[in-house]
């Protein structure tokens, strides 16, 4: 029997509205048979005209993809992640915006009925750094989002916009 581990999402630094049970989500996730879809690692310098496009498709019952993008000082990059899955897909995206750099992450969910998508976005903004997260949730299935962005300098900023079909 495959080992299942618990994944905790949306862990708040201080419990609020605990009686509504919105402080965190606990998911069972099978690590033993998880298919590693590999990693994408990029370091960007300058202002990129072409976005980095990533088509991420789940394989098998459980699969995982890791993405790590660093925008070097005074750089700008747009990343477009399109998710597709029939079963369970975990996408872990790590972003680093160096001094006065901007990262725009656009996530488009296009998963199937009965699927489960977990999108975990972590990031760090240095002085004047900015991360923008735009999510379009138009597919089917269950979607879990977990975002944690550290603002580590003067003028560092984060903005998020999410749109979904109910």
What are these regions, as identified by a protein language model?
Residues 4-5, 37-166:
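Conserved beta-strand/loop scaffold segments within soluble protein domains that form the structured core
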Residues 1-38:
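Short, Gly/Pro- and small/polar-rich lid/capping loops
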């Amino acid at each position: 029997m495959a080992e299942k581990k618990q994944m905790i999402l949306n862990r708040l630094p201080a419990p609020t509205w605990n009686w509504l049970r919105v402080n965190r989500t606990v998911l069972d996730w099978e690590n033993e048979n998880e298919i590693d879809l590999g990693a994408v690692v990029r370091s960007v310098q300058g202002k990129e005209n072409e976005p980095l496009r990533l088509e991420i498709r789940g394989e098998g019952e459980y699969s995982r993809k890791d993405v790590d993008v660093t925008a070097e000082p005074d750089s700008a990059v747009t990343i477009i992640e399109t998710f597709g899955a029939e079963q369970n897909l975990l996408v872990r995206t790590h972003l680093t915006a160096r001094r006065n750099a901007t990262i725009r992450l656009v996530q488009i969910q296009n998963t199937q009925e009965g699927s489960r998508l977990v999108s975990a976005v972590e990031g760090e903004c240095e002085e004047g750094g900015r991360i923008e997260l735009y999510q379009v949730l138009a597919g089917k299935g269950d979607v879990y989002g977990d975002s944690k962005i550290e603002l580590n300098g003067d003028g560092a900023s984060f903005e998020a916009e999410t749109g979904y079909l109910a």
